């Protein structure tokens, strides 16, 4: 990619990577489509998983789909739930990440516009976007770049510190209180650059193991008089509306693999037909 502007900026950067995606689906007897998918990403093809690993993953996907095809359909439910690590990543990207993109704070998408300096997450949470990270915890990251699509040098943006909202992701288009770009002007498909997420990282100073989260889920379900809570193991991006142009401020994330966690100790039960919907307010 080549970038030149009247400020005298000249940027040449190449971005090559390898990605393999596996998708499979089955149809239940009632006609419900049941998709599952996975992907592998690396900047060098030699760092992709072995063929044996990917074949084993594909076979496991078929086994899970076979069970999912015969799983019960859920009823409407309001109650406690927990998300796996990968599912939490999608959740934060859709529900939180899009609402800290500066251009969305104009024209009605103002969920957090007046929340700067206020507590928006638990005090042990830190959220930042860092396009300079090529990997994190041993995983290569797709959001890595050195300069954004407006020629601005990439940098880490600490969006939330100790639960308090500090900053938004900015392109060259200013926002009240945030007059300058912080290296997040991005484009796709030849469109105009807008402020978009890079590598969104969510950290906590008070982490819990999966076993601890399950125990907390069961206790909360008991408090609410529920027979079970839900565990979202795998989800895929749905859509989010941020209130721009008068649209409803809402989100819809598509769960692919969801389990009922029973409070009486029964085995976890795979279910289908789940939608994860709501508003961020």
Could you say what each language-model-derived stretch is?
Residues 1-156, 161-164, 177, 225-227, ...:
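Active-site bordering "gate/hinge" segments
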């Amino acid at each position: 990619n080549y970038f030149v502007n009247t400020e005298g900026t000249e940027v040449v950067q190449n971005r090559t990577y390898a990605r393999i995606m596996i998708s499979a689906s089955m149809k239940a007897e009632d006609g419900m489509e049941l998709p599952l998918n996975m992907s592998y990403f690396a900047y060098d093809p030699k760092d992709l998983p072995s063929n044996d690993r990917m074949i084993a993953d594909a076979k496991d996907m078929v086994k899970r789909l076979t069970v999912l095809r015969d799983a019960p359909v859920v009823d409407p439910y309001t109650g406690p739930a927990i998300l796996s690590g990968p599912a939490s990543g999608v959740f934060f990207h859709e529900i939180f990440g899009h609402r800290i993109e500066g251009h969305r704070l104009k024209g009605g998408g103002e969920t957090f516009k007046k929340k700067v300096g206020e507590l928006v997450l638990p005090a042990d949470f830190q959220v930042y976007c860092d396009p300079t990270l090529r990997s994190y915890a041993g995983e290569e990251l797709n959001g890595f770049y050195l300069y954004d699509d407006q020629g601005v040098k990439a940098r880490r943006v600490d969006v939330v510190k100790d639960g308090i909202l500090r900053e938004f992701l900015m392109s060259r288009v200013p926002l009240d209180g945030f007059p300058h770009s912080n290296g997040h002007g991005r484009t796709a498909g030849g469109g105009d650059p807008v402020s978009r997420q890079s590598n969104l990282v969510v950290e906590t100073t008070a982490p819990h193991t999966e076993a601890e989260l399950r125990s907390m889920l069961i206790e909360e379900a008991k408090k609410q008089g529920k027979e079970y809570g839900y565990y979202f193991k795998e989800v895929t991006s749905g859509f989010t509306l941020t209130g721009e142009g008068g649209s409803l401020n809402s989100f819809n994330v598509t769960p692919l693999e969801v389990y009922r966690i029973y409070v009486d100790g029964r085995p976890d039960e795979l279910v289908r037909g789940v939608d994860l919907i709501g508003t961020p307010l």
